[in-house]
């Protein structure tokens, strides 16, 4: 059954970002996604990291079946190197060695990094009790997936294969209790597929039963989703859905380390988990890019196969990313500085006065409620009142009054030395001579900088303006 035509859609540029990325460095993740390591492209060139033998170069093994002369285009990963490879689809990577043992001129490679996700490892089995104690069966057509499917149908978490024909199921969290064995000790071929490893004599290879399931729900930050029936070829007429939902993720990074779909009618789709809109579609004639990002935290993975042309399938590796949002900074007040102007008249030597003009401005880098250089909070001023509330403002006012008093005292001393008589109040109205006695002083105070004093001449003077600058009408 073909997928609904309604899901035929264009790629969403807003939700899907294609981006080529470099391959992961060795040791940062799994280097194999197949059960037999046919996809291994690592750089191990010894049969074992400890006590192993060096591998021969593939371009120097012309006397053997596999070499660069016979496979010059890099088939099977061969080349001018001596890295372990699996060009013939054996149960694990191998290489030619110089020292023959009983006429054997090659050896399997023990590669810790070449273990497909879902493969829990190779373990010892002493038999009483076995590592998995749920149920078991034997079959002369056993494969990895037939054993996994059998255990999954019985609601078990783990499936184990031993000696190529025995299948064990269980939920035992201590399946490792008898000890772990080298992966090469579980290389007995499955009776149903000679390219798959199915344990060994007294050795059991374990798998998670989620491997190869048709559908599932994923919420972990990262995981691998395999095509149905993996590592066997996917069956005909498959329609499978997997949900990948990681709340809080800013985007999910996807890559296809394995993609073997040969029919254009068989397809893999990524859908928006909320709207079910198709974000991307891949099939035999449209392969996925190396990697890409989906800017969602909820994605549905869909797979459809028709009734012909089966293949190996796919492995999808996803990694959710949660980005911490930067803390919001308080808004900077960019408005015009609020100017509070108050006038004060001070009597100087019998009605000789000087007026003080206060201009308090806000610093562009501070909100108007905050006095620069102080942690105190000052409440906002009323629209119809010149009175400023708050202890901080009173402190500033006191400082200004003291400053003005000092200036006035200095003026008085200057006037006293230059004049020996104090004019009467009536004479002040007719006094127009220039000098400091008839000049008005203005002080502009900016909290963020300093106090500047300059002279400002006023045309009209009134003795009725002798008021405290902080007292309103």
From Swiss-Prot:
- Primary gene name: KREMEN1
Please list the residue ranges annotated as the Kringle domain. Answer: 31-114
Q: How does it sit in the membrane?
A: Single-pass type I membrane protein
Q: Name one GO cellular component term.
A: plasma membrane
Q: Give the range the annotation lists for the signal sequence.
A: 1-19
The cross-references to SMART domains, in alphabetical order and at most eight, read: CUB, KR, WSC
Report the Pfam families cross-referenced here: CUB (PF00431), Kringle (PF00051), WSC (PF01822)
Which domain of life does the UniProt lineage start with? Eukaryota
Describe its assembly: Forms a ternary complex with DKK1 and LRP6. Interacts with LRP6 in a DKK1-dependent manner. Interacts with DKK1 and RSPO1 (via FU repeats).
- Residue ranges of every copy of the CUB domain listed in the record: 214-321
The name on file for this protein is Kremen protein 1
**What ranges are annotated Extracellular (topological domains)?**
21-392
Where would I find the WSC domain in this sequence? Answer: 116-210
Instruction: Report if keyword Disulfide bond is assigned.
Output: yes
> InterPro entries under this entry?
CUB_dom, Kremen, Kremen_rcpt, Kringle, Kringle-like, Kringle_CS, Kringle_sf, Sperma_CUB_dom_sf
